Amino acid sequence: MTICKAPLLAVVDDDAEVRMALTRFVSSAGFEVEAFESGAAFLRSVDDHEPDCVLLDLHMPGTNGFDVQRAMAPAHAGVPVIVITGHDSSEARARALSGGAKGYLCKPVDGATLLQTIDAAIAGRTAKAGWRRP
């Protein structure tokens, strides 16, 4: 039997409580997780360690979520981004989705909805690797 490596998710959020809660939740669902306290910290690591999916806050000091999306393209355009924000607006939603986000969720995030969104976003990557969430 071949054991497949779990997909790697990057959690990028400046709020430590949210970052830790998301990390614990997706880890318990079987994903590998790297957490980043800022968009700049994530961008410094992405070239060396590309995740299978990014859970991205929009409103962070310094390098915000929109900046991260823009900086990821084109080198990492194939990495799905799911925006998780506490500041919902139709303008932000449209901007994130037009920037390539595969999902847009508002805090507080429902766990089942988050997992469904992640599964849909990484379906192509995990099908190739043969991984399924436990």
Roles of regions detected by a PLM:
Residues 60:
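Receiver (REC) domain active-site loop signature in two-component systems and cognate sites
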Residues 67, 88-103:
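Alpha4 helix (beta4-alpha4-beta5 surface) of REC/receiver domains from two-component response regulators
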Residues 91, 109-119:
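C-terminal output helix
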